[in-house]
A protein has these predicted regions:
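Active-site loop/oxyanion-hole signature of alpha/beta-hydrolase fold enzymes
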Residues: 42, 55-99, 106, 112-114, ...
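Conserved alpha/beta-hydrolase catalytic His-Asp/Glu region
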Residues: 156-240
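Conserved alpha/beta-hydrolase "acid-adjacent" motif
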Residues: 254-260
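Alpha/beta-hydrolase fold catalytic core
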Residues: 1-28, 49-51, 85, 89-90, ...
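Catalytic histidine-centered segment of alpha/beta-hydrolase-like enzymes
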Residues: 255, 278-291
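Flexible "cap/lid" loop of the alpha/beta hydrolase fold
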Residues: 120-181
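Short beta-strand/loop motif that positions the catalytic acidic residue
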Residues: 241, 247-249, 253
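Conserved HGGG/HGGXW glycine-rich cap/lid loop of the alpha/beta-hydrolase fold
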Residues: 20-65
Length: 300
């Protein structure tokens, strides 16, 4: 695939992005998650050469600049909005992962952008609930919702969900971020590798080249503290989306509970698919399914 590395200046930042320079009028825009960059989508993009691909690194990630600190998720939204307008991307399928899902949700509400979005696919999206409280509080606040969605055929899964809610909280995220601030590049990389294997790739590891590429992306992140604030504070309040949307979420996600994905799908009027044997990296664990759904959405 002819995948070009490009830069565009906007909002006093230099935003890096991948562009396959396709002549197709069928466009796809990818928005990556936290600790990653556009490179996390490369293996998916390789299978989409018939379409015009745009995949930016958000401010403070990957090869993009970080001249101005972000103060909320809306700074990311502003950058991607300007990116879309400057490149005049129209009638596109928006594919987002994790933190990128929150950015995509807000773009879908923007008066200048929403009519440009053809449809959306959310992969393990962030946005239903902030990581402001610990797992026990989250479980208490949403107990009836969780109870209604329990798997009574496979009760062991419910115990795993509760355990995850009780133990995965903002302190864990911040500890992980702190480990990335350690001195010594190799030490940082070793900590990131452990973090990725434990929480992101808990079921299946990517090929070594892809795995190390993603480790390099994490090393490049410069907005750790600011993003931690976003994870604590952001919750989507925009109601149903105007465009067709799909949420794909792994049953074994250790970062964002698949139930949060379901609740978000209900809130935005999206179709929801719970994916068995799938963790947070939906692109890794269910690569073919992701590609199939993207092609289906683009061709509609």
């Amino acid at each position: 695939m002819n995948l070009k590395e490009k830069h565009i200046e906007l909002n006093d930042e230099e935003i890096f992005y991948l562009d396959n320079e396709s002549k197709s009028e069928k466009n796809i825009l990818f928005i990556h998650g936290n600790m990653y960059s556009s490179s996390c989508f490369i293996e998916i993009i390789k299978e989409l050469e018939d379409y015009h691909i745009f995949a930016p690194d958000m401010r403070g990630y990957g090869k993009s600049s970080y001249n101005n600190k972000i103060t909320s998720i809306y700074d990311f939204v502003s950058d991607i909005k300007e990116f879309i307008l400057r490149l005049d991307i129209k009638n596109f399928t928006l594919v987002s992962w994790s933190l990128g899902g929150g950015v995509a949700l807000e773009l879908a509400r923007d008066k200048d952008i929403k009519d440009r979005i053809k449809n959306q696919i959310f992969l393990a999206p962030f946005g239903y609930a902030p990581f402001k409280t610990n797992g026990a509080d989250i479980l208490t606040n949403n107990f009836h919702e969780y109870l209604n969605n329990f798997d009574f055929i496979n009760p062991q899964k419910n115990l795993e969900i509760i355990k995850g809610l009780m133990t995965f909280n903002m302190n864990l995220i911040e500890d992980s971020f702190a480990s990335m601030g350690m001195t010594g590049t190799e030490l940082k990389k070793d900590n990131i590798r452990v973090l990725f294997k434990t929480f992101i790739y808990n079921l299946k590891l990517p090929e070594k080249e892809e795995f190390e590429r993603n480790v390099e992306s994490a090393i490049r992140q410069r907005n750790l503290d600011e993003v931690a604030g976003i994870l604590r504070d952001y919750k989507y309040h925009g109601g149903s989306l105007a465009m067709k949307s799909l949420v794909l979420h792994g049953y074994d996600d250790k970062i964002i509970s698949y139930m949060d994905g379901k609740f978000l799908a209900d809130e935005i009027g999206a179709k929801f698919e719970k994916l068995d044997n799938c963790g947070h990296s939906v692109m890794t664990d269910k690569k073919n399914l992701v590609i199939k759904n993207i092609k289906k959405f683009v061709e509609e």
